[in-house]
């Protein structure tokens, strides 16, 4: 990895993390359900699906932009560790149905949004 690529990943990661912090603060919890985390994970999944859809369908995305958006921004925006912690917290509080819904919603929403982003990139 060269310095330009490292800077692209670092800048994207910083912006993604700041955006996550902002968005998560808008809707952190709704009736014990961590909506903010679901939102940021869904948005990152959509962007990543769109980016890799562009690549798959033949659009030339420079490698430094792929690093900035994919690894950097989407990596900083999404948060598997917070999702895991929030699910664990729901289990610890004996909110078993909410914990299961959190897992199901995150898996379904993120995979669906990757797919939708991928398809929308086709043009």
From Swiss-Prot:
Top-level taxon: Archaea
Q: How does it sit in the membrane?
A: Multi-pass membrane protein
Q: What keywords does the record list, in alphabetical order? A: Cell membrane, Ion channel, Ion transport, Membrane, Metal-binding, Sodium, Transmembrane, Transmembrane helix, Transport
State which residue ranges cross the membrane. 7-27, 39-59, 68-88, 101-121
Localization in the cell: Cell membrane
Q: Which NCBIfam families does UniProt cross-reference here?
A: crcB
Q: Which organism is it from?
A: Thermococcus gammatolerans (strain DSM 15229 / JCM 11827 / EJ3)
Q: Name the family the entry cites.
A: Belongs to the fluoride channel Fluc/FEX (TC 1.A.43) family.
- Spell out the molecular function terms from Gene Ontology: fluoride channel activity; metal ion binding
Q: How is its activity regulated?
A: Na(+) is not transported, but it plays an essential structural role and its presence is essential for fluoride channel function.
Q: What GO terms fall under cellular component here?
A: plasma membrane
What is this protein identified as?
Answer: Fluoride-specific ion channel FluC
Q: Which gene encodes it?
A: fluC
Q: What does this protein do?
A: Fluoride-specific ion channel. Important for reducing fluoride concentration in the cell, thus reducing its toxicity.
Q: Which reaction does it catalyse?
A: fluoride(in) = fluoride(out)
